Amino acid sequence: MKFKLLVFAFFVVATSMAQHKISGIVKDSVGNPLEMANIIAINQSTKGLESYFITDAKGYYKLNLSNNATFELRISYLGFASKTFVVSTSDAQKDMTKDFVLYENSDKLNEVELTYEMPVTIKGDTLIYNADSFTNGKEKKLGDVLKKLPGVEITDEDEVEVDGKKVSKIMVDGKDFFDGDSKLAVKNIPADAISKVEVLKNYNEVSQMKGLGNDEDNVALNIKLKQGKKNFWFGEVTAGGGPDDRYLAHPKLFYYSPKKSVNIITDFNNIGEVPFTFRDYFSFSGGFKNMNRRSGSNFNTSSNSLGLSMAKNNRAKEIETKFGALNFSYAPNKALDLNGFAIYSYTKTDMQTNATVTTLTNAFSNVENQQNNTLQTSQLGLLKFSAQYKPSLNFQLDYDVFLKNSNLEEVNNINSVSSITGDNTIDINKDDNPFSVNQNLNIYYTLNAKNIFSVAVQQLYERGNPLYNSLNTDQRFTILPAIDEAGSRFDLTQLKKLVTNKLDATIDYYYVLNDQSNINVTFGSSFNEQDLNTHIFQTLDNNTKIDFNADTLNNDVNFNFTDVYLGLHYKVITGNFTFTPGLKWHSYSYKNIQLGEELKQNPTKLLPDVFVKFDIKKSENITFNYNASTEFTDVNNLAEGLFLRNYNSLFSGNKNLTNPLYHNYTLRYFNFNMFSFTNIFGTINYSKKFNTIKSSATLLGIDRISSTINSSLPEDTFSANLRYSKRYGKLKTNASSRVSISNFNNIINGDVSNSKTTTQDYTASVATNFKKGPNFTVGYQTTVNDYETTRTTSTFTTDRPFANLEVPFFKSFTLLANYSYYNYSDKANTIKNNYTFLDADLYFQRDKSKWEFKLSVTNLLNTGSLNQDSFSEFITSTSQYFIQPRYWLLSLKYNL
């Protein structure tokens, strides 16, 4: 069977490669090559677009044409009269060379109307893909379309990357789609509504600011809709059901016009498809940017302080979700633009994990077997309103307000059997209701061609009230004065309240020297205040509460942090080089009051940075970036009273922590050849860390007491990424590699040891893209993790062959299948785990019908669990994580 599949794949590849080639040069009347002239080949029998090319800098073109056919070549260039040429191919005919000379058209830019649009066109910094040129009509969502575009990748987290850079915003007809969130866009925008995909490189939302700074890392997508989708409501309604009360309901509705847009997305299911996780919730910025990122210093507030469990690979034993989202935009006039969104998500997740944890130190050894059952519910709410006022090209005002509110609950039941402590049953309850409101005001003003100003003010209010409760048959820590009631479990509760107020402001002044250079002066400030209160108590069998009032067991901390800084940058473009050196001077002041003492520190820092770009040619460049940065921890790591982190883990902060210093170096190479659809992207990054904040842990059997310290030992990280993709006719090849090396230090039981981790990831794949007939993707991924310490060395390898299949048959049927095989092992041959996932979907839809029927089988091979292992110098963990069993679902979709 494997041999037959191999022969079939070879036959498909060989057939696609058996083509006739015609190449040559396109020149003007005096012999100068014409770069970016368009050449298309129309099959005279089918009247379809057979091949196309855009000439390179030397005017060169190359077309691949099918044998035994006649084609009309159409050659065009803006401002020149077009030409046509008829050519016939045959098996016996050799490859052909043909040059073309175009003559300037003085009357009109181009009199010939092209019947077919070019698959790819370039307009300045915008790369425009004609979606129909890369798709075959079987695509369902935007993500399916983007995967077929050269240079565009979709990550496992549904983030979009172009040339290795994360897309910061996705728009539809120029309007933000849920503030540009990529996951909601790739999963919900219907593929059949897409006309073009515009890649906006060097993107800047404010036209006045474009080109003043370095926007090379800013990439946005604009999805252009087909004409039939404008000024009309469109969308789809999907409903389905299956055995064991499986259900799915997924209505979506969209409306776009020049003045307004509405997007409505809903999703109700219990089949494990989670449209919006609380990982998405915590990372969802609402379009708000970190204002201090360019300043070189960061003050980051903690999120998910409860330490909630995360689903692995978006899978769990059972998942039920209810999701609803509304996004709108409205432009009452040319000067004012209003938009906003509301999102609600409810998810109930049932997780089960069995684990064996082995601890081996110089003082003791212990083996603990755990069975952990977790029931987690989350209700997440987000609300945002934005207004943009732009009465002229010289003035723009933006205002945003963004609210986030949630209710998070988690119940854990843990059975622990330890070689030291014996049997133990633990029930853990976690609850939190975090709330935040973020406001943003931006003003951009162009006084004249030489003087440009921008002002930004951002305010954040954040509140959290996490509750932690545990019922434990053992008293884990003698430091806690718990009362031992015979035959009862220890009932401990920790209440925590954290309030954060943050106000950031910056003023930027740009003095434009000429078209190639400008000077930027920045004055900024950041004011932060945090109030933290924690309290631990025990509840007895008669519901009496025993408060632990010792100062070391509670926290009452007030923390203030202020950063005032002045920055200077100079940008100059000379020849093919862009050079931007900069310097920031920071004056910091931070104060924390706890345990009756006040601690103040007033450090200053001078942080340099430099950006260099060398344009080898229009679509090939090298960039280098260096910056020095520093980071300040929030109050959670400074509070010295005890925190209950888990049934076997306590934590205490360190009020004397100081800020670490980072030196970051990044070198990037980018090359996109749209003439051959070859994309090469590479990055090398090196980061050196000084005065790092480290966790210092004391292990006592299965228990751990941790704190934080500043380490004088330097640590560094090196990483390199390389991605290569190329198209050969109907074949798309991809290859990528990632390597990272980290040197860091562990402090356990007072001993300091150096550790080195090396991660290597290599992936290669081949995919076909035929308009008719089967399509497939086959690939192989291998990941190697090396962990080296002063005591031991371990190597873990994961091999994953994967394949995707798309088979249309009987005109109205399409079969889709996705297969992945995981093989996990270690170099010492002590671990060997493997599991397989196979999902299949059978679609039925008549031509031009609005109805679609779908039969889905998920986890077809009924894989019951995922096996995972982790390793450190003292602790080795092997876990079995259970997932949803095989199920099938019959669904019906109606396209509106």
Predicted regions and their residues:
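Outer-membrane beta-barrel transmembrane domain signature of Gram-negative proteins
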Residues: K384, L492-T580, N592-E597, K613-D615, ...
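A short, solvent-exposed loop/turn motif at the edges and junctions
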Residues: I42-G48, T70-V86
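Membrane-proximal, glycine/serine-rich, low-complexity loop/turn segments characteristic
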Residues: Q19, I25, G31, K58-K62, ...
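Conserved C-terminal beta-signal and adjacent last beta-strands/turns
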Residues: T763-Q781, S794-L896
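Outer membrane beta-barrel strand-and-loop segments of large Gram-negative receptors
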Residues: Q371, F548-N554, S652, T658, ...
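Short, acidic Ser/Thr/Gly-rich low-complexity loop/linker segments typical of extracellular
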Residues: S45-Y60
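Short, ordered, surface-exposed loop/turn motifs in non-cytosolic proteins
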Residues: V30-N43
